[in-house]
Amino acid sequence: MVYAFNWKKLSISAALGYRWDGKRCRLWFQTQPGSYNDERLIAFVRDLKKHLRGQAAILIWDGLPAHKSRKMKQYLESQRSWLEVETLPGYSPDLNPVEDLWSNIKGQELANRCVAGLGEAEDGVCSGMDRVRQSMLPFSFLHHAGLFF
């Protein structure tokens, strides 16, 4: 069997947004071919700002090199009026609710699949994101990370 698909060609960025009172959770995501770099992540944060409609937010993310670049740091500094950024300790995926999101989708929509191309892989990801959005799973991801209300 010849299998030419390479997972490194599809990247996904996601944000889980929790209200301070625990009444609502929102999920935003973006897929793209290739890898994320600081420019693409800045565009994702800009899109996130539009969705939040001026509401203040705390962004908690891991140590991906693009999160720590000089360009990203300068951009985040310019967004301090609405965005506070906290970085998770190194090697701590158990503290990141988005890691549980990835695990859930990989274990459901992407499990045991031999996709023919990026479009099919992206369809599986989008289907999984829709399923998670319509459930209470994001709250379980938060609880698993020890960050429950």
Regions from the PLM with identified roles:
Residues G17-D21, L64-H67, Y91-P93, L147:
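Short, solvent-exposed loop/turn segments at secondary-structure junctions
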Residues V45, Q55-H67, N96:
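Acidic/histidine-rich, metal-coordinating catalytic segments
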Residues R70-Q74:
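Distinct, well-ordered alpha-helical segments
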